[in-house]
Amino acid sequence: MLGGTDIMATPQGGEPGGLEEPKKMTREDWRKKKELEEQRKLGNAPAEVDEEGKDINPHIPQYISSVPWYVDPSKRPTLKHQRPQDEKQKYFSQMDEWYKKGVKEGSITTKYRQGACENCGSLTHKKKDCFERPRRVGARFTGVSIAPDEYEQPQLMLDYDGKRDRWNGYNPEEHTRIVEEHSKVDLAKRTLKAQKLQEELASGKLSEQVSSPRHQWGEDEQNSQTEKDRNSEDEDEDKYADDIDMPGQNFDSKRRITVRNLRIREDTAKYLRNLNLNSAYYDPKTRAMRGNPYADAGKTPEEVSYAGDNFVRYTGDTISMAQTQLFAWEAYEKGSDVHLQADPTKLEVLAQSFKVKKEDFEHEQKKSILEKYGGQEHLNIPPVELLLAQTEDYVEYSRHGTVIKGQEKAVAKSKYEEDILINNHTCIWGSYWKDGRWGYKCCHSFVKMSYCTGEAGKDINNTDICEEDLMPTEEEMTKPKTLVEIHQEKLKDKKKKKKHRKSGDSDSDNDEKKKKDKLKKALNAEEARLKQVEEMMQLDERKRGYNSVYESREPTEEEMEAYRMKRLRPDDPMASFLGK
């Protein structure tokens, strides 16, 4: 029974051109197929091969190895659809491809070439794309005045690394020119040095130098010829050292090495000014120290050479930027659509125009006030420093023009009038002092603006009878009172209170009477107004008068009270009984 059961399966092979219906597969064939797959997974059977001859991993699931019907109608297992497609791959330029440089000019073609432009003879375009004036007889037939090929640069497709390669397009052969120049310089130096040695040997100077005692002890003579030669060699070396000289580096021309100096300045680093960990914070990323490193030591910023970087925050355009931001906020609150970051140009133009208008308005306002009230002469005065002699400098010069004495500021005068004597006084007020009081020294008077009494005033003011003696003493002030005196004072206080009450009662009665009279008048006026309103409502609208003569003022308290008393209240249940 098992062998007779059929299963629908897809054939392993088929015609690549057409779509075939799935053929029936018996259960025996299905079992053989599964056994073959197991053998392939175990490695006992060779792996399946695709159309390119590549092995298919037997462990790959069927839904991956099977080709969709819209890709390959043959239904043959393959992994081609899982690999990158050639038509979708990006091809980049090779390392040897680069832009053309140093194109030779002046090469002229004298013969027409096959495939060139029939009009001008250039190989880079055709006749329909030629920009030259159409010739009566083209270059194809005449072979005269053949135009050169156009200069076209290749379109390079560079990948991520190719775009960032700093040596891309570099030709190492260009460096040979520099190497040749240095080799020629070295050869010339050696030749020159050999000639000098031969000249010294011929003249005998070299033998004298060797036999000198300074040379025997290993010392060179000062200003010798060899020293000059060495100096000249150093100058030649410095010629090339200048090209390599950079800030922060030392170039040794003898050994041709470069020594990097991490710090070439002689000042103290910020982080070394105060080694306390709780002192000003040093940010190593920005190399900034905003706080004062000497703040813990109790030194003011004026006493130290470095007080932090906070002063930089208020230099440049910082203050003007803050003023512009404040103007933007104020303008936005008043309805102007401006913003410092969104539209800075608009804000700057608006701020400048506002500043000009404000200055013009203040000038016009000042001008109008001066025209109306006057006082321009009080504004045209010299500075206060000149009025009070603040700028007077006394300087003495010698015959030779040097300063002997001077450069001292003039003493500032007091704002009060000085040395002015009044009322026959010979001394000013404040020239005499006694018992905590100021007075005149000429008459010992303690009364300001008084008339001078001379020596007689001195005798009177210096007598033992003083105002203090006439004043009652503390003992008299604190003297105990008798019972009769205390009783009399109480009676006086009671009488005063009774009088105050009577006067207060009479005043309150008068006020109440006045209020009642005012309220009565207001009620009568309200009744008259209501009657007038009823009469006006009975008339036709066209016969009513105008309200142009109506007096508008704030109603008094009595009028408001009368209005409330006479007002109709329809919600009041007792309103119907008011008219009865």
Curated annotation (Swiss-Prot):
InterPro entries: Slu7_dom, Splicing_factor_SLU7. Pfam families: Slu7. Keywords: Cytoplasm, Metal-binding, mRNA processing, mRNA splicing, Nucleus, Spliceosome, Zinc, Zinc-finger. It comes from the Eukaryota. Residues 232-245 have a biased composition (Acidic residues). The keyword Transcription regulation does not apply. Residues 493-502 have a biased composition (Basic residues). The keyword Cell division does not apply. GO terms for molecular function: pre-mRNA 3'-splice site binding; zinc ion binding. Residues 1-59, 200-252, 488-580 are annotated as: Disordered. A zinc finger (CCHC-type) spans 115-132. GO terms for cellular component: cytoplasm; nuclear speck; spliceosomal complex. It is found in: Nucleus; Nucleus speckle; Cytoplasm. Residues 20-41, 523-544, 551-572 have a biased composition (Basic and acidic residues). GO terms for biological process: mRNA splicing, via spliceosome; RNA splicing. Component of pre-catalytic, catalytic and post-catalytic spliceosomes. Associates with the spliceosome prior to recognition of the 3'-splice site for step II, probably during catalysis of step I. PANTHER family: PRE-MRNA-SPLICING FACTOR SLU7 (PTHR12942:SF2), STEP II SPLICING FACTOR SLU7 (PTHR12942). Required for pre-mRNA splicing as component of the spliceosome. Participates in the second catalytic step of pre-mRNA splicing, when the free hydroxyl group of exon I attacks the 3'-splice site to generate spliced mRNA and the excised lariat intron. Required for holding exon 1 properly in the spliceosome and for correct AG identification when more than one possible AG exists in 3'-splicing site region. May be involved in the activation of proximal AG. Probably also involved in alternative splicing regulation. Belongs to the SLU7 family. This is Pre-mRNA-splicing factor SLU7. It comes from Xenopus laevis.
